[in-house]
């Protein structure tokens, strides 16, 4: 019983970590807002809709986070 849900759960969180790694590698190219040292605003990776790459990363991150949560509930 628990083998498949554990594998699916692990795959979901592997995708979550991959999205964070991609965001780290691409830096400001996938940021949703530009960093502004004068206003002390940091770049975000998962908010906004002006940048298509930002929106795609958010959607994939959200999907796999929710899917992982569902698999966690199935395991319990």
Curated annotation (Swiss-Prot):
The chain crosses the membrane at residues 6-26, 55-75. Receptor for Wnt proteins. Most of frizzled receptors are coupled to the beta-catenin canonical signaling pathway, which leads to the activation of disheveled proteins, inhibition of GSK-3 kinase, nuclear accumulation of beta-catenin and activation of Wnt target genes. A second signaling pathway involving PKC and calcium fluxes has been seen for some family members, but it is not yet clear if it represents a distinct pathway or if it can be integrated in the canonical pathway, as PKC seems to be required for Wnt-mediated inactivation of GSK-3 kinase. Residues 27-54 are extracellular. Its main location: membrane. Coiled coil: none annotated. GO terms for cellular component: apical plasma membrane; cell surface. GO terms for biological process: nervous system development; Wnt signaling pathway. Residues 1-5, 76 are cytoplasmic. Keywords: Cell membrane, Developmental protein, G-protein coupled receptor, Glycoprotein, Membrane, Neurogenesis, Receptor, Transducer, Transmembrane, Transmembrane helix, Wnt signaling pathway. The FZ domain is involved in binding with Wnt ligands. The gene is FZD3. It is a multi-pass membrane protein. PROSITE patterns: G_PROTEIN_RECEP_F2_4. Gene3D superfamilies: Rhodopsin 7-helix transmembrane proteins (1.20.1070.10). Belongs to the G-protein coupled receptor Fz/Smo family. GO terms for molecular function: G protein-coupled receptor activity. Glycans are attached at residue 33. This is Frizzled-3. It is found in: Membrane; Cell membrane; Cell surface; Apical cell membrane.
